[in-house]
Curated annotation (Swiss-Prot):
InterPro entries: ATP_synth_asu-like_sf, ATP_synth_asu_C, ATP_synth_asu_C_sf, ATP_synth_F1_a_nt-bd_dom, ATP_synth_F1_asu, ATPase_a/bsu_AS, ATPase_F1/V1/A1_a/bsu_N, ATPase_F1/V1/A1_a/bsu_N_sf. Its EC number is 7.1.2.2. Keywords: ATP synthesis, ATP-binding, Cell membrane, CF(1), Hydrogen ion transport, Ion transport, Membrane, Nucleotide-binding, Translocase, Transport. This is ATP synthase subunit alpha.
């Protein structure tokens, strides 16, 4: 009897202390699934860009909000989602792991490591889709970001916080310029993010290997959404990269981000939009493709001092077809960015590397970030090249040229030889200024064109190894033009070196 009373008392006590916790879940059902997209009914309160969870813990993103159906892109193989599957709202937007732990790592578009190294600490996360800094949170670009490439730093300079497009046909050296820019940030306290969209895994593996070999991977994060990845992951990759870069920018750091390339990103978004049955527009791209790219690139900025003064410098890459920069996506991105570096395949095939078309390349804000000394040294370069290109076109008609015209042609050929540069060998600002002084003061006129490569190599070695001359160079103030006396001393040393070189006394 007592035993029955005890059991009854225990049950009564459990009932009195029971706290019923009711969990509400917004759930729906998959109506149609195919090609990586599911149409779902029953979760009408879902937000745009919200994560939803299918059975088997498969995630998707709500990208189409209609009256009765929700268009969801599936973030895994569509074989794991079936018609009739249950879908649950997560009430959270997609986010990615951020922080210094990502330096030296290779991750996918969701922030999951794919380099075989240790797992990441996921306690620090940031939303992939965030708003760009407001106008009041920014300031004008006034600090230079050196690429180490003479033709770029002198003619189309890039500033921290700028968006500079690299555009050209395939196999013209677009990625090479971007990677060289990353290599040149070593020791400059600039973090780098390289986003590979639709690239071959083998090509990205070579890039990662090069960065590691050159000691650049330690300040770089690589995000890979390869050609074999699903369209949703290729679409998300650049926004993931921007979120990672924004974390560092808000921590008062300077960041360089490469989007390689936005042509493939546009194709991935077009694929998604057509599968979601959105109306196609020009070249079958959806109507909001301009918004997608402007929303992405506007997240690159130079923050004001009140916001910490951090920056994101973006180098988006666009691939053209047969040099057509008037196509839809190229014109879109050209109008969004602060300038473009146009690479021409004819220049590349003729051996001019980097194959930059000076006439079509421009930097709209970068000159404000150049030092006064660099501005002075490069002031006559663009004019010399413009005169050369004009005369070169005229000379093709077989007209007889006077001595002055022939001098301009010869000088232009030599300038282009000076501008040639091997990849993975960036030049310091001092080295660039010394080469530009050669051009500015017409000292290359006494050299033969075929001897320019050998002369350039010997001259740069002389600048670094001759103690007295090196002291003069190191005393140059980048914020001021050269004093006449200092310039005269430097020119005398250079002239003496050229005379020795022409006599064959320099090896």
């Amino acid at each position: 009897m007592n035993k029955d009373i005890n059991i009854a008392a225990i049950i009564k006590n459990e009932i009195e202390n029971f706290e019923g916790k009711i969990q509400n879940h917004d759930i729906g059902k998959v109506i149609i699934v195919g090609d990586g997209v599911a149409l779902v009914s029953g979760i009408e309160k879902v937000k745009f860009g919200e994560l939803v969870e299918f059975e088997n813990n498969v995630l998707g993103i709500a990208l189409n909000l209609e009256q009765d159906l929700i268009g969801v892109v599936i973030m895994a193989s569509e074989n794991s989602v079936f018609q009739g599957s249950i879908v649950r709202r997560t009430k959270s937007v997609i986010s990615i792991t951020v922080g210094d732990q990502l330096l030296g790592r290779v991750v996918n578009a969701l922030g999951i490591p794919i380099d075989g190294k240790a797992e990441l600490d996921n306690s620090l996360k940031s939303a992939i889709f965030t708003n760009a800094p407001s106008i009041m949170d920014r300031k004008s670009v006034d600090r230079g970001l050196k690429t180490g490439i003479l033709a770029i730093d002198s003619l189309v300079p890039i500033g921290k916080g700028q968006r500079e497009l690299i555009i050209g046909d395939r196999q013209t050296g677009k990625t090479t310029i971007a990677i060289d820019a990353i290599l040149n940030q070593k020791g400059k306290n600039v973090y780098c993010v390289y986003v590979a969209i639709g690239q071959k895994n083998s090509s990205v593996a070579q890039i990662v290997s090069l960065l590691e070999k050159k000691g650049a991977l330690e300040y770089t994060t690589v995000i890979l959404a390869g050609a074999s990845e699903l369209s949703p992951l290729q679409y998300l990759a650049p926004y993931s990269g921007a979120a990672i870069a924004e974390y560092w920018m808000n921590k008062k750091k300077d960041v360089l981000i490469i989007y390689d390339d936005l042509s493939k990103h546009a194709i991935a978004y077009r694929t998604l939009s057509l599968l979601l049955r959105r109306p196609p527009g020009r070249e079958a791209f959806p109507g909001d493709i301009f918004y997608q790219h402007s929303y992405l690139l506007e997240r690159s900025a130079q923050l004001s001092n009140d916001k910490g003064g951090g920056s994101i410098t973006a180098l988006p890459i666009i691939e053209t077809q047969a040099g057509d920069i008037s196509a839809y996506i190229p014109t879109n991105v050209i109008s969004i960015t602060d300038g473009q570096i146009f690479l021409r395949d004819s220049l590349f095939n003729s051996g001019q590397k980097p194959a930059i078309d000076i006439g079509l390349s421009v930097s709209r804000v970068g000159s404000a970030a150049q030092t006064n000394l660099m501005k002075w040294a490069s002031s006559s370069l663009k004019l010399n090249l413009a005169q050369y290109n004009e005369l070169k076109a005229f000379a093709q008609f077989g007209s007889d040229l006077g001595p002055s015209s022939q001098l301009i042609l010869d000088r232009g050929n030599k300038i282009y030889e000076i501008l040639k540069q091997e990849n993975q060998y960036p030049l310091t600002e001092r080295q660039q200024i010394m080469l530009l002084i050669l051009i500015r003061e017409n000292l290359i006129d006494s050299l033969e064109q075929k001897s320019i490569p050998l002369f350039k190599s010997a001259f740069l070695k002389y600048c670094d190894s001759e103690p007295k001359f090196r002291d003069k160079i190191e005393k140059m103030d980048y914020n001021r033009v050269l004093e006449p006396n200092n310039l005269a001393g430097i020119l005398k040393d250079i002239t003496d070196f050229i005379e020795k070189f022409n006599l064959g006394n320099v090896f």
